[in-house]
Amino acid sequence: MKKIGVLTSGGDSPGMNATIRAVVRRGIYMGLDIYGIYYGFSGLINGNIEKLEIGSVGDIIHRGGTILHTSRSEEFKTEMGQQKGFDNLKELGIEGLIVIGGDGSFKGAEKLSQMGLPVIGVPGTIDNDIPETEMSIGFDTALNTVIEAIDRIRDTATSHERIFVIEVMGRDCGNLALWSGLAGGAESVLIPEIDYDMEKVIERLKHGYKRGKKHSIIIVAEGVKPGAEIGKEIKERAGLDNRVTVLGHVQRGGTPTAYDRMLGSRLGAKAVDLLVAGESDKMIGMRDYKLVPVQFKDVFSKIEEPDYDIYELSQSLSI
């Protein structure tokens, strides 16, 4: 194998640039030519591909986002789009591909693998919702961003003696809400995987006030329902005044933490090593801090479950 391509797809996450840097430098170190594919699978179809040098990835390890840009491609879901992308790679003599993204990106990667192109997936999403890996690139940074926001909001919640509902990302997976709820000392955490009882949420708030609490923080994952609806429900049912903050896309941006830089660097280098070793149709997962290749089919056959121990712990510590 002499030429490898790399792309980022789907939602961006802090640490992707560290991964790209590792792919390029590890590849060049091993005597390979590395090609960057811009704008994800859309760029693959449109031929937005160029050779990357060591200098192409200088001064990016500390930057959020992705220098290769990203997108979601409906065209690549079609056989014609997949063939077009495959042909563009073959025309340039690219013999392997590294795809950085989430499960949707890996489904696109698997299609190319089935067409005969060696492909390795690297998990990158702030949702940390990919099965068969304990951590995905960007989750730690997003978690710290949410914690910083909680700390700041708690200051004003204390000053005004008020309830704040904070909506965080997590359409189908509540890991970001769950972990930030525990680390941020939230009074209640609502996630998509566990049905909530508003009466119990209100009871917990009132119990806190009886003990002398002057403010409360409720973390809600966007997949439960909009934070504004939760706030309205609390007001209508219990007459408790509250404010709602939607953190939105601020959770995706910003300087990656040391952890995400390390994780991205390790995963990127490992992806190159696997391609050179003849591996394909796999994602690199992490278990007990060790990197483990996992077949795409095993990733797709499972649903990421929340850590119920963390949920129980969060509940018990927020009394």
From Swiss-Prot:
Pfam families the UniProt entry points to: PFK
Chain positions recorded as ADP binding sites: R21, A22, V23, V24, R25, R154, G185, A186, E187, R211, K213, K214, H215
Active-site residues, Swiss-Prot/TrEMBL: D127 (proton acceptor)
Binding-site list for Mg(2+): D103
Keywords per UniProt: Allosteric enzyme, ATP-binding, Cytoplasm, Glycolysis, Kinase, Magnesium, Metal-binding, Nucleotide-binding, Transferase
Listed cofactors: Mg(2+)
Regulation: Allosterically activated by ADP and other diphosphonucleosides, and allosterically inhibited by phosphoenolpyruvate.
Pathway membership: Carbohydrate degradation; glycolysis; D-glyceraldehyde 3-phosphate and glycerone phosphate from D-glucose: step 3/4
Broad class of where this protein is predominantly found: cytoplasm
Gene Ontology cellular-component annotations: 6-phosphofructokinase complex
Reaction(s) catalysed (UniProt annotation): beta-D-fructose 6-phosphate + ATP = beta-D-fructose 1,6-bisphosphate + ADP + H(+)
Keyword Metal-binding: yes
UniProt record similarity statement: Belongs to the phosphofructokinase type A (PFKA) family. ATP-dependent PFK group I subfamily. Prokaryotic clade 'B1' sub-subfamily.
Subunit structure: Homotetramer.
Stated name of the protein: ATP-dependent 6-phosphofructokinase
Originating organism: Natranaerobius thermophilus (strain ATCC BAA-1301 / DSM 18059 / JW/NM-WN-LF)
Highest classification ranks of the organism: Bacteria, Bacillati, Bacillota, Clostridia, Natranaerobiales
